């Protein structure tokens, strides 16, 4: 019972039946590894920080892939200042096997990870998604977390599932 007359069990049951929006969050398995795909928005550190908190909450060994194709479709310049508002320091722990940086700014992401004191041997730069997913499938450990801008979600999923590839 509550002050406003809601039944807690009923409320929890109703909320648990809300379907997951697969455009924002997706989960499947690959080779006995759970693959989480978290859709983020470039230029928006808040979405990336929420994804990092989700990753941090799960304490198993994991591999991450982080990147995007385009920073902005609105502007003609590539402002990366927002990258330094992302709390990559949350990943500075023993639960990370590898962090694979992809896309045109893969080296910029790797540099930001180094500033977060992530061990350099955990940071891998592979700009092309097809090559990155091959590496993840064969040379990494743990569950897989894709922290990706919306423009990389479909190519990542397709390459992980062995469907039509794309970079």
Model-identified regions with their sequence ranges:
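ATP-dependent carboxylate-amine ligase
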Residues: 2-7, 13-167
């Amino acid at each position: 019972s509550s002050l406003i007359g809601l039944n807690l069990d009923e409320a929890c049951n109703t909320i648990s039946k809300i379907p997951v929006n697969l455009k924002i969050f997706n989960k499947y398995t690959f080779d006995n590894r759970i693959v989480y795909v978290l859709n983020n928005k470039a230029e928006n550190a808040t979405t990336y920080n929420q994804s990092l908190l989700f990753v941090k909450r799960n304490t198993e060994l994991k591999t991450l892939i982080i990147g995007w194709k385009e920073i902005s479709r609105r502007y003609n310049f590539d402002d990366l200042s927002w990258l330094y508002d992302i709390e990559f320091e949350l990943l500075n722990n023993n639960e990370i096997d590898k962090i694979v940086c992809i896309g045109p700014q893969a080296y910029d992401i790797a540099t930001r990870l180094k500033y977060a004191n992530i061990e350099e041997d955990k940071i891998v730069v592979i700009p092309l998604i097809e090559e990155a997913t091959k590496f993840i499938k064969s040379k990494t450990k743990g569950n897989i977390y894709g922290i990706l801008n919306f423009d990389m979600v479909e190519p990542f999923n397709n390459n992980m599932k062995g469907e039509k590839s794309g970079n």
